Amino acid sequence: MPARRQWFGDRRVLKRIVLAVLALVILPYALIFFYVLPFIHPVSTLMLRDLVLLRGYDRRWVSLDEIAPVLVQSVMMSEDGQYCFHGGVDWAEMRMLVEDTLKGQATRGGSTIPMQTAKNLFLWNSRSFVRKAMELPLAVSTDFVLSKRRLMEIYLNIAEWGPGIYGIEAAAQHHFKVPASKLTRRQASLLAVSLPNPIDRNAGKPGRGLRRLAGVIERRAQGSGDYIKCIYE
C-alpha cells in the first residue's frame, strides 16, 4: 500500500509539473490577444528583471502618433526593411541565416521586428536555438493578431535603448533631451542603429562608426516610400 500511495503521489506531482509547463507555453499566446487593447501597456522581460533586481527603469509609454515618423522610418530601414510585407518572419532571410550557420560562417541577426517584439515580451535575452524555436511561432502569432501599427507601437515602447532606458520616449529624453515627437532625422537614425547593442552603442555620444551607420540609415529612411505604407497609409 505505501508503494501504491507513493505512485499516486508521484503521478500527482508529475501532472502538476506538466500542467504548469503547458500554462507557461500557452500564456504568451493568450497575452497576445490581450495586447490588442490600445490602453494596455505591456512590459518586457528585461523590465521585469530590473524590477526583481530592484534596479528600476525609465519607460514612458507614448502612442504611435506621438512618435516622429522619421524614427519609425529609421527603425524599419535599420531593423526590418520587409516589415510591411512578411507575416512575422522573413523566411528568405532565415534561410540564408541557416545556410551561413551550416557553413560555419558569421551570421547576421535575422530577427524581424515581430520576432524581436516576441522575444522582448515573452522570452529571455541570450541567444540559443531553443529560444529561436520558441520565438518563431510567437512572432507569426503576434503579427497575425496585432495590426502592424499596434505591433510597431509596442515594439518602440519596450525596446531597450540603454541601461534601464526602455521605449522611445525615455530614449529621446535621455539621449537628446527632446520628446519622441520632436526627434530629427539624424537623431532618429542614431537611435535606430543603436538598437542591436544599446548597452555599447550610445546614440547620444556616437563614435565615428556609429555616425557612419546612422548616415546610411538616414539615406534609406528618406527613400523608404512603399516600405512603410502599412504604418502610414
Swiss-Prot record:
UniProt keyword terms in alphabetical order: Cell inner membrane, Cell membrane, Cell shape, Cell wall biogenesis/degradation, Glycosyltransferase, Membrane, Peptidoglycan synthesis, Transferase, Transmembrane, Transmembrane helix
Main location: membrane
InterPro entries the record matches: Glyco_trans_51, Lysozyme-like_dom_sf, PBP_transglycosylase, Pep_trsgly
Single Gene Ontology BP annotation: cell wall organization
Protein location: Cell inner membrane
Top-tier EC class: transferase
Membrane topology annotation: Single-pass membrane protein
GO MF annotations, alphabetized: pentosyltransferase activity; peptidoglycan glycosyltransferase activity
SUPFAM superfamilies per the UniProt record, alphabetical: Lysozyme-like (SSF53955)
Pathway: Cell wall biogenesis; peptidoglycan biosynthesis
Enzymatic reactions: [GlcNAc-(1->4)-Mur2Ac(oyl-L-Ala-gamma-D-Glu-L-Lys-D-Ala-D-Ala)](n)-di-trans,octa-cis-undecaprenyl diphosphate + beta-D-GlcNAc-(1->4)-Mur2Ac(oyl-L-Ala-gamma-D-Glu-L-Lys-D-Ala-D-Ala)-di-trans,octa-cis-undecaprenyl diphosphate = [GlcNAc-(1->4)-Mur2Ac(oyl-L-Ala-gamma-D-Glu-L-Lys-D-Ala-D-Ala)](n+1)-di-trans,octa-cis-undecaprenyl diphosphate + di-trans,octa-cis-undecaprenyl diphosphate + H(+)
UniProt EC number: 2.4.99.28
Superkingdom of the organism of origin: Bacteria
Listed transmembrane segments: 17-37
One term under GO cellular component: peptidoglycan-based cell wall
Function: Peptidoglycan polymerase that catalyzes glycan chain elongation from lipid-linked precursors.
UniProt family annotation: Belongs to the glycosyltransferase 51 family.
Protein name stated in the entry: Biosynthetic peptidoglycan transglycosylase
Organism: Rhizobium leguminosarum bv. trifolii (strain WSM2304)
